[in-house]
Every structure is written in structure tokens, then in C-alpha cells.
Amino acid sequence: MKTRDIVKEAVQKLGYKKLRKAQIQPINDLMDGKDILLIAPTSMGKSAVFQVPGLAQAKQKPGSWVLVIEPTLALIHDQVRRLREKSISAACLTGENAGNGDDVLTQVRRGEITFLFTTPEQLQSYRFQTMLVPNHNPWLVVVDEAHCLTEWGSFHFRPAYRSIGQTIQKMKHRPVVAAMTATAPMRYRIDIVLSLGMKKPKLHYTSLAKPNLKLVVRDYTLDTSVLDSLPVSKREKKRQLEKLREKTLQNKLKEAVRLIKKYGSGGSVILYATTRNSVEFVYNNLKEREELKGQVVKYHSGMTAEKKNKVLGKFLSGKKRIIVATSAFGMGIDKEDVRLVLHFELPLSPVEWYQQIGRAGRDGRDAHVVLFYQEDDIKQNRAILAGKKTMREIEELPDTLQSITLDEIQTSVCKLEALVDLLHQDSCLFQGLLRYLGEWNAPACGCCSICQRNRKKKGV
């Protein structure tokens, strides 16, 4: 068969009617043996870019296989499940199935597996390094969600990310390398290319704009001016401040319910909170609301793998419509009907914010993304990043910040400051976010809360 026919067959087997324009050239480059750096929005269909050539190569050269490195178990399980549903040979090697690791790798060596999904940590395991690295090499290595290499790849948090390039260099037959992400400012791109040892990679960039998303920021900053003028003791002022905080918290919960009913009734809802404790608090409140009973689940890294998998399955299948989660959830999760993404608290960086709002509107229909902004959140996040939380409060730390060095703290605080500056600007929120991500020619979206406010000022 001709290569064109083999690719067409692969496209059909994967269930696609046809490839999108933005997918064709990256696929051609991989088929030609060229490294690629693909930067595209979450709804672009990046998985097809490595799945199509992976199937085509296996057809042309039986025994060829693709190694896909993912940051989270949820993403691995989702990818493997989707491929198996299409009768495509896919497997995973994670800490969960390490006991069967030898069997999985033996299947790969026999040519029985076309796609093997793993984590950076498992890639560095003795089993992997001895059974596959010396001889039975993949023809393609894919680093999915490649921004994690820069965001997470540190000596203290996930150092294995920094060893991926070294593992590739050890391989007897150097594979083609593909790095894919939706969020890579220029310094991220340089870091990814150098760390992975990519050879003259072809850059494929698709605009990160999402015209179907309506971006709204709600300011819940406490007005303490009245308290400051009260002729009462400091103790009484503190008590009044706590009452004001509690009232604001209840107002946020009421507004969250209103938004879920208004925008989320036609599909699914993801509600993000910064810490596990916040997730538990919001979840416990929402699940008791009469109009939401039986619809809400929670997800964070403090839960067992079995529990998280069950929750993920219920949400993806539509059995549960609303999920309250930390940043441990959502990266790469493909659920088309998410109509609302709500941040109950301030995210930690512009990159994290963009990644999470990218869960909404993947079907191309209008969706809303709402951020509850509060000065107290900034103080909380700064305190977390600066390491001022004590070890006994470790459960309150975001899932990605359980361990962090001083240099990493300073870098993370800079990212937080960039997000705060973005929220304080008088111009389009989406435009500012895209410019941070390197898309300098991004136009104003015309529909975010800032654009709407400016339009009202002009009387348009």
C-alpha cells in the first residue's frame, strides 16, 4: 500500500472523518522523521498528530511502537481507554500496574503493543531502562503536555522530567521526538527543545484564541474601610472581619450555584479550587444543595487512585455532571460538553489558568469561564509559594506544590504576579492572557468582562 492510503486507513480506524488542516503538516513531518514542537489549543486534536503516524508506521513496519509520556494517571487512563475502544493495541506502565510491568514490556518487545503510555518516573525505572532502552526502541517518543517539563521539572518536585532527554540519548536507534502543549511562552519552548535534545524541530503553531469562550472575572475583594473607621477594639474588628469573610464566602457559594444553573444546565461543569481543603469545603456545600443533589463529585490527589478513577469515569460518562477539583484534574481530559469552568479561587499562574479554562467548549459551542477574584486569594497564594505554611498545614497546599525550592518559589511568585497584573489591566483579558503565552498579535475578544465594561463606558 502507498503511504497516503496507509495514513487514510489510520485516520478511519481512529474514527476521524478527515484530518484538520492544522494536523496535516505535523503528521507529515513525523512521517518524514522530523522532530516537532506542536503548540495548539486544547481542542485542536493533538492526539491525532501522533496516533495517525503511529498506526501508519506500525502498518508499514510491523513491531514499530510509540512511547507517550504523560504527566498524570488520569490522562494516561483516558488515552488508553479511547484507543482500546477503537480496537487499537495500547497499554500503560504506571506505579499502579508496576507489578505487571514485565508483562507489559514483554508485549511491547513482541510487537503486540503499538502505543505505550507512561510517566516520566516510570521511564526512569530499572525495568524500563534495562528492557527497552538498550535495544527495543520506539520509533517515536511523544512528550504530551510538554509545558510540564518547565512547570514541574525540578530537582524537588518531578526531577524525572529532566531525565527524559538523557533516556532518549541512550537509545541505540534515536527515535523521532514530538513535544506537544497548549501553553508554551518562548522561554518554555527553548527549555523544552534543549532539555529533550530535539534536533532542528519543526515548530507548528496554531492560534490559542478561543472565540467561543466568554471569560468573566468577579471581584469579591473585601471592603474593610467601614471596619477601619469603627471605634471598637482590635479584637472586635477581627471578629467583624471574620464575619465579613464568612458572608463573602457564602455569597461566592450562592453565585456558584446560580452560575451552574444558568450556564451549566446544558452540559458539564468543572469547579476549580486551589487547595484540597477548599475542594472539600465547596464540595460538601454544593452536594447538599437540593437542586444539585446527586450531581456533584470531587477530585484531588489526596484520594486513592481507585477512587479517582471511579470519579473520573462517572464524570466522563455523564453519570455525574459537576466536578469540584484541584489542578490534579483536567489536563488533557477530553469532554466536549463542558459549558462552565468556574475558578472558586485564584489560580497560581497564567499558564495554569489557560490550561484549566481550556476544558470548556471543546465542541465549539459557546461556554463560560468565570474566575472569582479576591485580594485574600493573592495573599494566600503568595504565602503558599513563599513557604510560609507550616508542615502541619501541608494538606492545604496545592497538589503541585508539596515540595519546592527557594529558586522555584521565586519563579512561581513571578508567575502569580503576572496573573494578578493581567487581572488588573484595563484591556481585554483574553488578549492579555494570549500575549503572556507568546501570541503578541492576538486581537481583543470583544466579549470578556473587561471588553464589555469598556464598551459600556463608550456607550456602545
What spans do the regions from the language model cover?
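Alpha-helix N-cap and coil->helix boundary residues
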Residues: 2, 21-23, 428
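Alpha-helix N-cap/N′ positions at the starts of helices
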Residues: 2, 159, 411-414
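Helicase motor core with emphasis on the C-terminal RecA-like subdomain
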Residues: 5-10, 18-21, 31-47, 54-58, ...
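Short alpha-helical "packing" element that flanks the helix-turn-helix/winged-helix DNA-binding module
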Residues: 23-26, 419
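C-terminal accessory/connector segments of nucleic-acid motor ATPases
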Residues: 293-294, 396-460
